[in-house]
Structure formats: structure tokens, C-alpha cells
């Protein structure tokens, strides 16, 4: 059980490291996606 907890800690640390690398990119992608969705909504409302 102790070994499992150790593995979990190591896994979480590496996961956190990956998240730190990926998060800024994901945030940028999310903003771009939100903006394009908002633009689509605006276009749709104008067409109605």
C-alpha cells in the first residue's frame, strides 16, 4: 500500500508538470474556441 501511495505521488507530480506545460496552450485554445463560438452566435443572430 505504501508503494502504491509513492507511485501515486510520483504520478501526480509528473501529471502536474505536464499540466503546467499544457495549460497555457489549452487556455489559448479555449479562448480562441470561445471567441469563434461567440462570433458564430453573433452571425446567427444577425441572420435571423
UniProtKB/Swiss-Prot annotation:
GO terms assigned for molecular function: toxin activity
Keyword Methyltransferase: no
Keyword vocabulary terms for this entry: Antibiotic, Antimicrobial, Cytolysis, Hemolysis, Ion transport, Membrane, Secreted, Target cell membrane, Target membrane, Toxin, Transmembrane, Transport
Organ and tissue specificity: Expressed by the venom gland.
Keyword Transport attributed: yes
GO terms, biological process: defense response to bacterium; killing of cells of another organism; monoatomic ion transport
Main location: secreted
Entry's localization field: Secreted; Target cell membrane
TM segment ranges: none
GO annotations of cellular component type: extracellular region; membrane; other organism cell membrane
Protein family (similarity comment): Belongs to the cationic peptide 02 (oxyopinin-2) family.
Function: Disrupts cell membranes, particularly those rich in phosphocholine, through formation of pores. Has antimicrobial activity against Gram-negative bacterium E.coli, Gram-positive bacteria B.subtilis and S.aureus, and hemolytic activity against sheep, pig and guinea pig erythrocytes. Has insecticidal activity against S.frugiperda ovarian cells by opening non-selective ion channels. Enhances the insecticidal activity of spider venom neurotoxic peptides.
Protein name: M-oxotoxin-Ot1a
Source organism of the structure: Oxyopes takobius
Amino acid at each position: 500500500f505504501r508503494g502504491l501511495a509513492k507511485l501515486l505521488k510520483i504520478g501526480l507530480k509528473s501529471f502536474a508538470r505536464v499540466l503546467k506545460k499544457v495549460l497555457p496552450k489549452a487556455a489559448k485554445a479555449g479562448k480562441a474556441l470561445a471567441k469563434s463560438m461567440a462570433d458564430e452566435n453573433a452571425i446567427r443572430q444577425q441572420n435571423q
